């Protein structure tokens, strides 16, 4: 009953084959290694095991720890765990978050702790967390953590735990498992090459001389139009910023996502991409894996990565969960990438295309959130009652700790700002701002 309620809370009707295999294979006496492509549902797979291993009589102690390589992935995992029907206390620790807020949250130990390696060590060294009672350790996207150089940090954390059950997940084959991990009776579940789990992708090339590459990109963006949700990958943030300037000069709505941005700006860029306010996201490999970005239609490699693994992970952002997607490779005539072995069809671009129209939705921020006991339903009701807009003019809503973000139709913005500002939601006076 608990599993079915959990799935219902997540809006899922049934587990996929990989998740069913993980659930049926799980045995407390055996550690698990799950190899499965990006976007196949690994987070839910290990969350179901965590749900089985939670004990009410251990309240006040950290029972499960999930280590993630990036703060974006850690936040995504936190949201999945919060949907558990028994509502365990979940705390997420990551770089860029307010340390005082994290310390206050840790005064009462959560049942489930999610975090990035560096921030977990920070709190361990200051005795803000106690991992001595841990019964479950999950190293999510373990290959990515090693790639990012977190070997020593993970070794230090693992030495503090001694969890009786450990689980590793990876979207690529592991060459070896580091010796600091003492895994017992390891069971490996490998879906990397299973039919139906490899992304259903169509590949196209766009070949242009170096001096014409930006023009070709603009043509491709215009050809795809305003309804295609598109991720554009570059190898460096400078290239992202340069393309962003080009699009801004032409009033093409888009967002950027890379490590040079403040955490709040990165989260807002992803939020607006999720809720349909923007259909174009320029990014580095920071967005290549572990992020919950549903329904991406197209990937454009403006610059191809140097390694095949990075190429695979970028492409995993589209065709998620058995959907379909198109990958466009922007090549110079002299480019030679060893991992590009299959013949690909060239995308034909005309001389001119109309600029993409604006997305139907835009994002507003409301200055009330979870701490004010405000729910999504409260926000919808407020906008309908106070601003007088129709229910179908309100899109995705995300309620954060101190504020909330709501997608609304662009045509309704003026009315909402005029009539909705300085009203009260759940007794809290709110301001409504453009995001």
Each predicted region: which residue ranges?
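Interdomain hinge/linker at the junction between the two RecA-like core domains of SF2 helicases
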Residues: 96-97, 173-220
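Conserved segment of the helicase C-terminal RecA-like domain
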Residues: 280, 307-351
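Post-DEXD/H (motif II) to motif III coupling segment of the RecA-like Helicase ATP-binding lobe
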Residues: 122, 130-194, 340-343
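Conserved helicase ATPase motor motifs in RecA-like P-loop NTPase domains
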Residues: 16-19, 35-40, 65-71, 139-144, ...
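Conserved interdomain hinge at the start of the Helicase C-terminal
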Residues: 156, 199-248, 388
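Conserved pre-motif I regulatory segment
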Residues: 1-35
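Conserved nucleic-acid-binding Ia/Ib motif block in the N-terminal RecA-like helicase ATPase lobe
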Residues: 5, 59-125, 133-136, 242-259, ...
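Walker A/P-loop NTP-binding motif
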Residues: 20-32, 43-59, 75, 80-84
């Amino acid at each position: 009953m608990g599993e079915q309620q959990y799935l219902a809370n997540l809006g899922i009707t049934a587990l996929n084959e990989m998740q069913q295999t993980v659930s049926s294979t799980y045995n407390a006496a055996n550690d698990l290694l799950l190899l499965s492509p990006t976007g196949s549902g690994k987070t839910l797979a290990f969350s179901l095991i965590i749900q089985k291993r939670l004990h009410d009589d251990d309240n006040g102690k950290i029972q499960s720890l999930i280590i993630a390589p990036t703060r974006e992935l850690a936040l995504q995992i936190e949201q999945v765990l919060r949907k558990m029907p028994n509502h365990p206390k979940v705390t997420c620790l990551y770089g860029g978050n307010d340390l005082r807020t994290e310390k206050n949250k840790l005064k009462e130990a959560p049942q489930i702790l999610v975090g990035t390696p560096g921030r977990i060590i920070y709190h361990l060294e200051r005795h803000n967390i106690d991992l001595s009672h841990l019964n479950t350790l999950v190293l999510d996207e373990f290959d990515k953590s090693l790639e990012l150089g977190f070997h020593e940090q993970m070794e230090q954390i693992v030495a503090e735990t001694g969890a009786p059950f450990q689980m590793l997940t990876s979207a690529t084959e592991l060459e070896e498992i580091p010796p600091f991990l003492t895994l017992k009776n390891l069971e490996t579940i490998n879906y990397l090459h299973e039919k139906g789990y490899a992304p259903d992708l169509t590949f196209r090339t766009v070949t242009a001389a170096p001096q014409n590459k930006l023009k070709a990109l603009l043509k491709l963006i215009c050809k795809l139009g305003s309804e295609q949700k598109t991720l554009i990958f570059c190898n460096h943030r400078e290239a992202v910023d340069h393309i962003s300037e080009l699009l801004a000069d032409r009033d093409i709505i888009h967002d950027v996502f890379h490590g040079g941005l403040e955490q709040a700006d990165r989260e807002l860029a992803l939020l607006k991409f999720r809720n349909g306010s923007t259909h174009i996201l320029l990014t580095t490999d920071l967005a290549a894996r572990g992020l919950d970005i549903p329904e991406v239609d197209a990937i454009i490699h403006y610059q191809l990565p140097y390694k095949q693994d990075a190429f695979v992970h970028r492409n995993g952002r589209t065709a998620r969960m058995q959907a379909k997607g198109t990958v466009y490779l922007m090549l110079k005539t002299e480019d030679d990438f060893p991992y590009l072995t299959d013949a690909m069809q060239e995308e034909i671009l005309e001389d001119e295309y109309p600029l993409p129209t604006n997305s139907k939705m835009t994002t507003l921020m409301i200055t009330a959130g979870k701490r004010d006991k405000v729910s999504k339903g409260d926000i919808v009701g407020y906008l309908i009652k106070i601003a007088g807009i129709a229910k179908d003019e309100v899109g995705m809503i995300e309620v954060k700790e101190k504020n909330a973000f709501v997608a609304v139709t662009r045509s309704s913005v003026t009315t909402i700002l005029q009539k909705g500002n300085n009203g009260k939601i759940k007794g809290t006076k709110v301001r409504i701002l453009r995001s």
